[in-house]
Amino acid sequence: MTILSAITSISRPNKASKSSVSSFGGASLSMGSNSVACGGCGGGSSGPRGPGGVAVGVAVDVNINLGVVVGGVLGLVGGILGGGGSSGSCGCH
């Protein structure tokens, strides 16, 4: 599945859902139905890396409802860009 198809894939528009994005480097992102992106920090040292430390081949597990598409796109970008670096984690602030 490509990132574009994951973003445009919308399921269960009437039900609140949670989106989750992770990369090979261990960075993860989750988003509740309130459109607040959580995570995007704490990439590990494992997995193939492309230029700038961004993990190549992002594994995406997405269940986006219609009300959180914009937040999901922004959170996805933040999760990918935050994927490099030392181990750790970030939550909702």
Curated annotation (Swiss-Prot):
InterPro entries: HssA/B-like_chaperone, HssA/B-related. The gene is hssA. It comes from Dictyostelium discoideum (Social amoeba). It comes from the Eukaryota. Residues 16-26 have a biased composition (Low complexity). This is Protein hssA. Residues 1-14 have a biased composition (Polar residues). Belongs to the hssA/B family. Residues 1-26 are annotated as: Disordered. GO terms for biological process: sorocarp development.
